[in-house]
A protein has these predicted regions:
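Two-component/phosphorelay signaling modules centered on CheY-like receiver
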Residues: 11-33
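Conserved phosphotransfer cores of two-component systems
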Residues: 24, 46-48, 78-85, 107
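Acidic, metal-coordinating helix/loop segments flanking the phosphotransfer/catalytic sites
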Residues: 33-52, 56, 60-62, 81
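Short amphipathic alpha-helix used as the core "switch/output" element in two-component signaling
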Residues: 43, 62-84
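Alpha4 helix (beta4-alpha4-beta5 surface) of REC/receiver domains from two-component response regulators
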Residues: 66-70, 74, 95-111
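Hydrophobic/aromatic residues positioned on beta-strands within the core alpha/beta folds
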Residues: 91-92
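C-terminal output helix
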Residues: 105, 117-126
C-alpha cells in the first residue's frame, strides 16, 4: 500500500485527486491523507511517513490574527529540512515556467502539475515519482 499526502485548500481539487487514485490504481492500493493548510500538513509529516506528497504551491497559513497566503514552497523547504525523502509533486494554477515552479524544482520537488489536471500527465508523473517502489505495492 502506498501512502500519499494531498495538501490543497480547495475541496474540489482533493475530490478530483481522490477520484483519480480510485480509478488509476494499476493494481496498487493507495491510502490517501489530506491536509488543507501548510500547518496541518507539517504536523502530519512530523507524525507519519508518506510515499508521495502532492503539494499545492500556494497555501493559506493561519497565524493568530489573520490568514496569509504563503507559498507551498515554504512547506517544501521545511519538509526537506526534516529529512523527508518522499517525492513531492507541486500543484499550480499557473501556466508553466513561473519563478515559483522553477524554485520548487531547485528546492527538490520531483515535478509539478498544472490545474486543471491532465489525468494522463498526472498518471505518468505519479508512476514516475513512485518509481520502482510502485511495482511492489
Amino acid at each position: 500500500m502506498k501512502r500519499i499526502l494531498i495538501v490543497d485548500d480547495e475541496p474540489v481539487v482533493i475530490g478530483v485527486l481522490r477520484a483519480f487514485f480510485a480509478e488509476f490504481q494499476h493494481g496498487h492500493t493507495y491510502e490517501l491523507t489530506t491536509a488543507s493548510s501548510a500547518n496541518d500538513a507539517f504536523i502530519l509529516l512530523l507524525q507519519e511517513q508518506f510515499d508521495l506528497i502532492l503539494l499545492d504551491i500556494v497555501l493559506p497559513v493561519i497565524d493568530y490574527w489573520h490568514v496569509q497566503q504563503a507559498a507551498g514552497l515554504d512547506l517544501l523547504k521545511r519538509v526537506r529540512d526534516l529529512g523527508v525523502t518522499a517525492p513531492v509533486l507541486m500543484m499550480t494554477g499557473g501556466d508553466g515556467g513561473t519563478p515559483r515552479e522553477v524554485e520548487a524544482l531547485i528546492e527538490g520537488a520531483f515535478g509539478y502539475l498544472h490545474k486543471p489536471f491532465d489525468l494522463s500527465e498526472l498518471d505518468h508523473l505519479v508512476t514516475l515519482a513512485l518509481g520502482p517502489r510502485a511495482a511492489s505495492g
